[in-house]
Amino acid sequence: MKTWENHQIDGINRMPARAHFLTFPSKEKALLNNNRYTHAFKNLNGVWKFMFLDAPEYSPEGFFNSDFDVTKMDDITVPGNWQLQGYGKMHYSDLWYNFPINPPYVPTENPTGIYKRTFFVEESYRDKKIIIRFCGVDSAYHLWINGKEVGYSKVARNESEFDITDLIRVGEENDVTVRVYQWSDGTYLEDQDMWWESGIFRDVELIGVPKDGINDYKVIADLDDEYKNGIFKVEAFLRTTKEVNVTFELVDAGENTVFTKTVVAKEGKACIDEVIADVNHWTAETPYLYKLFMTVEDDGRIIEVIPQNVGFRNIRLNGETFLVNGVAIKFKGVNRHDYSPQNGRVVSREEIEKDIILMKQFNINAIRTSHYPNSYYLYDLCDEYGMYLIAETDLECHGFELTGDYKWITDDPSWELAYVSRMTRMIERDKNHPAIIFWSLGNESAFGCNFRKMTDVAHEMDPTRLVHYEGDFDVESADVYSTMYTWIENPKKPYLMKDIIEKSKKPHIHCEYCHAMGNGPGNLKDYQDLVYAHDKLQGGFVWEWFDHGIESFTESGEKYYRYGGDFGDDPSNKDFCIDGLIMPDRTPSPGLYEYKKVIEPITTTAIDIQKGIINLLSRYDFANLDRFNLVYKVMEDDVILQTGFMAVPSIEARANKDITLPYDLSVIKVKPGAHYYVNISYQLREDTSYASSGHELATAQFELPLYKEGIMVRPEGILNVEKEHTTLHVKGANFSLDFNLVNGNLMNIVRDGMQVLSKGPRLTLWRAPISNDMEIIDKLKKVYFLHLEHEVVMNIDYHMEGNILKVEVDTINSTTNSAWHFKTKYVYTVCPSGDILIDVEGTPSGRVDLAPDMLPRIGVSMHLDKSMEHVRYFGMGPGENYADSKEAAQMGLYANTVDGLFTNYVIPQENGNHMGCKWVSMTNDRGMGLLASTEGDFNFSASWYEDKDLDDAKHTCDLVKRDYIVFNVDYKQNALGTNSCGQWQLDKYRAKFEDFKLSFRLTPFNNKEVLDKHLAAERICLDK
């Protein structure tokens, strides 16, 4: 049997797994905690020689020898994935294996990479134990040093170390050869939802450590039952049985020694078990870290010093909740892969730190390391910045679900070692990180005897943490009840959130929810409201953090991102990897801004907004709200009338308090048609590790009880109306427009010789599909044909009422082959001033029983002159917003451009909607343009693209701007949902086949003659 097809071989000559740490010759250097100051450390990253083969058997004779001719080998960068460096084939799938399922066997044609390089070993390594460490190799490999075979390892995202002391020539050049196999028996356990990428993708390190030093250690920093004193235990395991002295010194954040003790190692082990009085606690909100220094001495000579961050916290079950430091915390988390758009799974510490900082800035407090141990940098950073971790085993065998025997290997005892060793190696590497709250057994691999064994071993190895596994549906072994994408409402689903609330006897975690694919996710607030309302619901992890697009360029140099199927990979789940809260270049999506708002640390409620009395409710689990300042602004449209600054008073976690904002509404002279709001911003009072003082973490907005009806304007002047064949010409003093008397359309509007509108409003029920329409798009297109719209004119009438023209158009609006339809009535009231009052009213008719249960939109679409790209509007902004994704938006007066309104999703789709709009102006550089306004409110969007353009385009580079602007005014836009994997649009947010009336006014104008907001405040009086 081939080594790489033997699931009962965990490794050959690999060292036992241990914690990842650095060792230093002195405390002074240990304080710097940088590998440059260790005893001996060499990073073997860089350019290696490389040979790509179709199978291991094609390896040339003697390829591992030191004298092998490498001149004909290619260069390759380590760390790196060979597919992104021109070898093999990129392939993305969510669950399919890329070969026949016949465990443990893999294809004979097994892409293989031979890596070679030389390296000089300095004198600093002499008399040291020399270890070579591979932090990540996909999927399995053999290792040779100086032509001698060292061993074999697998499990792509686990570290592996080999003792090569006896093979290294100190003071000379040495060489290393690694033969990597794309497929191994381990691949059956590495079927995660991600790109299949191979090679040496994490750091390779050459480490020299003292032979009498510490090989491994375990730190337990717990709390007593009163959560007051620290339970501090350390076990250090040495490489020697000599009775050396080991000093354990614990230093606080102020560099004060709080504990020190020296013990004599016995039989290769040194231990302490102490109580530290009145310790500071570690939490994600208050990540207080002590520093432990372990110093090994022999006869007064320092052998080594090892630094280790220590955080005291306690984790325990308490009936239907789990507690951290006695509190039933709420996870406000994300699932995170290691990912780079340029380098795939090769990520730097700097990239990871940017992620953590961004998460903290957006109120995220937890990460699930989906679905494998992430780069070790992540864990240090989560300890330091404050981020709870569910640390997940590199284990998923999702593809077996399609065989009808999901438990095929999960319930096969012969695979026990393969399952358990993956978890034990993870626990050993990461056991000393306070950020880790749960060990997770893996993902989407059914349940069976091997998971039972994993649970038992995890509890035995680490009784201080809890065990998570979503696949344990009956919560037979896991400590918490974990689910994915549990729906809030759906009569066809057997188990909803309400069932968890009513029936579950264990804490609940939503390990994946609110699938963030494309424009979305929706329903975030609905889920979070449930979490806040029920103790047993302890939050969840949005799927997921990144869009996993691969950075690419067109021939002209335009950047875009490729996804599944773009490399000829088949089968592929296509754009299912484009499902993150941030885009591939780490730009926050509108969904991330929405999530930030939904999980913000302060909930603000108006008690008496006229008097400025509001209530502040802390959503923190531990921190006090006195870390914030409050800035308020009383707004009149875009004008700040009053502003103030105050320190948020002391409010303990989860407590609330009324405060009064000292504004005075009595002095405000209310203007006709103006809108008044108070905007509240909660900002960090002091600099933190993740943001500067002044960074905003929470907001609130309340409409003020100030309003005066807009100025009534009676139309004056004369209209010239003339019928010419099928066209009705209308002229005023400085404008003209035409109606088509065949289809009833408003054909154009001209102001001072400039055509501001080239196609008038026409009812549309369609919008470009969003990624979250994935499960219903075929039904929308192939059953209801909603993208194939038809308007049949039943009657057109026009007449004068004094100096005002009324045009009435009755239509039937529906789609191809549909027996349901709207009876629609357009009423245009054209005034001599140039104002056009438009009412569009629809009534469901025909076979209403055959109509869809929701519509993409109900609104009208127009074409405007391409020069009118400057946008001002009073409505919800600044980002796009939809019925189930609008918490981050505030009412206000915003200025933008058509380009600026466009959200550049990796896969073009519906975007840029704004709800609650009172008016919108579209103008050119000279101020000439068109105003749309209403006494109620409407949705609007403006784009360079028709819905068909967005629907047809597969990438952003496929989009070609139209020579006009598409301007939409909608009665209702459908919600977003998360139905790419989860809850569809909730009933209360849907656009339905229902009676509707959309009323608005179009006014051609010059913004330099009259300001848009003043024009919008006018009310047209038609009374005689």
How would you label these PLM feature ranges?
Residues 81-84, 89, 96-105, 154, ...:
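An acidic-aromatic loop/edge-strand motif
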Residues 145, 229-264, 270-272, 292, ...:
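Beta-strand-rich binding/interaction modules
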Residues 3, 8-11, 34-35, 49-53, ...:
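Accessory beta-strand-rich segments of carbohydrate-active enzymes
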Residues 36-60, 77-78, 83-85, 196-199, ...:
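Substrate-binding clefts and catalytic carboxylate motifs of secreted carbohydrate-active enzymes
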Residues 80-134, 138-145, 151-154, 210-220, ...:
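Active-site-adjacent substrate/metal-binding segments within catalytic domains
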Residues 1-42, 49:
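N-terminal pre-domain segments of enzymes
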